[in-house]
Curated annotation (Swiss-Prot):
Single biological process term from Gene Ontology: asparaginyl-tRNA aminoacylation
Origin superkingdom: Bacteria
Source organism phylogeny: Bacteria, Bacillati, Cyanobacteriota, Cyanophyceae, Oscillatoriophycideae
Quaternary structure, from the entry: Homodimer.
UniProt-recorded name of the protein: Asparagine--tRNA ligase
NCBIfam families linked to this entry: asnS, PRK03932.1
Family label: Belongs to the class-II aminoacyl-tRNA synthetase family.
CDD domains reported in the protein's UniProt record: AsxRS_core, EcAsnRS_like_N
Species, as recorded: Microcystis aeruginosa (strain NIES-843 / IAM M-2473)
Reactions it catalyzes: tRNA(Asn) + L-asparagine + ATP = L-asparaginyl-tRNA(Asn) + AMP + diphosphate + H(+)
Compartments in which it is found: Cytoplasm
EC code(s) of this entry: 6.1.1.22
The gene coding this protein: asnS
Pfam families xrefs: tRNA-synt_2, tRNA_anti-codon
Keyword Chloroplast: no
Amino acid sequence: MTTRIKEIFQTGQPDQSVTVQGWVRTKRELKEFTFLEVNDGSSLANLQVILEPTLPDYENVLKTISTGAAIAVSGNLVPSPGKGQNIELKAAEITLYGDCPPDYPLQKKRHSFEFLRTIAHLRARTNTLGAVMRVRNACATAIHSFFQEKGFIWVHTPIITANDCEGAGELFTVTSLDLKKPANFAEDFFGKRAYLTVSGQLQAEVMAMALSNVYTFGPTFRAENSNTSRHLAEFWMVEPEMAFCDLEGDQDLAEAFLKYIFKFVLENCPEDLQFFNERIDKTVLSTAENIVNSEFGRITYSEAIELLEKADRQFEFPVEWGVDLQSEHERYLAEELFKKPVIVTNYPKTIKAFYMRLDDNNKTVSAMDILAPKIGEIIGGSQREERLDVLIQRMQEQGMNPDDLWWYLDLRRYGSVPHAGFGLGFERLVQFMTGMTNIRDVIPFPRTPLSADF
């Protein structure tokens, strides 16, 4: 039976017989014996394996096993006299599954993230990307745990849709038509234009109107031709929707949600977060602890504008009531003024989506964004417009044809209730958690303009 390396470091005892399987990170030959550093992906730390000349076929083992090779090692655990770990494995038997030639790209040196993106099929074998994937896994586990503990139902919304939820028009078209001929979408597979989804929100609202509290967690797509460190064409979104909920309840849930995730990852990935704190961003741990222990600030958009207008600095983008907050404004509020996450609410209706509930002043909507230090907006949400006549008017104001979303309007015709929800970009969360500067390095296979090789 194979034992994972993480388990060995947690509960392994001297003289315990184990078998480990993994990949050789380094090989160091001395006169009397050889050291291998082996990693199986379960932990940041490698397990040191000692090969002695008494090992069967020792000379051949030394010739065939190199950095990158896949092996299985059986033997007994022994106390380690060296620094860095308390226990190591004295090999009694070793099996080579797959050798690795000298042109293996991942040798014992630090590689740039730019280079690693060109070998995305191998980069998870590095310390940094392996740690990213473990933190990503912990974040996903925490998300499901949070909502399941609160009685939410996970619903699966469609990947292919005829709707543009965000109204941005940056959509990937799905078609079975011959692209060499003029397109007549009435003859296409669905009889109309179809797209890859940009959000599961509208369909999640449908489910919330029957199941009360639901959430989605799946891939979304934007055909936005942005080559930046903040944009991906394919990314994952978490989108809860709650029936019988208003803007205040939406804020409360979002704050509790973020705190839960950060606390979970702090408890379950301490070595990985310590690695990021030492190698990537020296504020990773303090930022995570700040999220968990701080009561988030709460201000309206109008109050935010007043604070920004009083700021003793010149912003690249001028501030006035009615403009959307830019990243520099969001980070100033979170990093310098509040020094913790802050929730900004009640934005002008002209800069927000049609489905957000119109406030009584007819100027703002019941929207909310959570702004976090270092990254800016991390969650965006709102109370949804539950009044049929107001929703139709808002759609018309934005140049939409209400008939295109007849089924969405039906939710307001048949048993409408106040409801609210929010969206969290999963990769943005992982980027924030790890301190990684480029969002392409927190997803296994980034999809960006001119990049879909893997």
